[in-house]
């Protein structure tokens, strides 16, 4: 089944498969299935056309998913950078935003290590 431009795994339960869509987590997936009247443990391959249509409608009406959600997140980050607040500066410098230490660690955010040459040792005579 294809939903919001994503191929959902047919062999997984509906509540888990829906989380493959960007912008839908476990809680949102449960809420969607509750509104559609579908059991959480029903597999995607077992869904009828009416049930699939109900899921699509609920997501289209109430949720921002995939490109729309990503775009909104990028816009929020760009706004922080434009107004020059602390969080925006941290984003601009590719450093952790939420107060984590950076003397050691923070490798994911900072990227691969850039070696800096140390002091040259004086040659003894």
UniProtKB/Swiss-Prot annotation:
Name of the featured protein: Small ribosomal subunit protein uS13
GO CC terms: cytosol; small ribosomal subunit
Record key words, sorted: Ribonucleoprotein, Ribosomal protein, RNA-binding, rRNA-binding, tRNA-binding
UniProt feature coiled coil, ranges: none
Function: Located at the top of the head of the 30S subunit, it contacts several helices of the 16S rRNA. In the 70S ribosome it contacts the 23S rRNA (bridge B1a) and protein L5 of the 50S subunit (bridge B1b), connecting the 2 subunits; these bridges are implicated in subunit movement. Contacts the tRNAs in the A and P-sites.
Alphabetical list of NCBIfam families matching this protein: uS13_bact
Underlying gene: rpsM
Subunit and partners: Part of the 30S ribosomal subunit. Forms a loose heterodimer with protein S19. Forms two bridges to the 50S subunit in the 70S ribosome.
Keyword RNA-binding: yes
GO molecular function: rRNA binding; structural constituent of ribosome; tRNA binding
Location of the region described as Disordered in the Swiss-Prot/TrEMBL record: 94-125
Pfam families in UniProt: Ribosomal_S13
The family this protein is said to belong to: Belongs to the universal ribosomal protein uS13 family.
InterPro entries registered for this protein in UniProt: Rbsml_uS13_C (IPR027437), Ribosomal_uS13 (IPR001892), Ribosomal_uS13-like_H2TH (IPR010979), Ribosomal_uS13_bac-type (IPR019980), Ribosomal_uS13_CS (IPR018269)
Alphabetical GO biological process terms: translation
Zinc-finger is among the record's keywords: no
